[in-house]
Design a protein with these regions (language model features):
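Class I S-adenosyl-L-methionine
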Residues: 1-123
Length: 123
């Protein structure tokens, strides 16, 4: 809800010593635009509007994250999340939190995602 987003913004403002990373699909709805813009303007916050795609596609300048099918050639400008190779831990990587990293790609994982990708490939 918008009220929840405003509360999240308040927490971000009150914790300037903490880096916040906000992956979101709410960027598509106009009622959230103002609060997401305010969040992104904070030096300790990285808002990552998520692409809805599961094939690695994204719109440059709009999306901050995308899902990459396993084995896919990584699109230019995408930093691949390394957590799957480090037991699900960031292990010092802070790409998701960095305003210098335009797009983070997350490798698709799990049985449900494999099924979704398989069905999409047949379409």
């Amino acid at each position: 809800s918008l009220q929840l987003a405003l509360k999240m913004y308040e927490v971000m403002v009150r914790t300037p010593h903490v880096k916040h990373w906000l992956p979101t699909r709410m960027h598509k709805f106009s009622k959230y635009q103002q609060v997401l813009t305010r969040m992104q303007a904070l030096p300790n916050v990285m808002v990552r509007p998520s692409s809805d795609a599961i094939d690695g596609t994204f719109t440059a300048g709009v999306h901050g994250s995308t899902i990459l099918p396993e084995g896919m050639t990584v699109p230019a400008g995408v930093k691949v999340c390394t957590a799957p190779t480090t037991n699900g831990k960031c292990s010092g990587c802070r790409a998701c939190y960095s305003k210098d990293v335009p797009v983070v790609g997350y490798i698709a994982h799990g049985r449900k995602m494999a099924k979704v990708i398989r069905i999409a490939a047949m379409a």
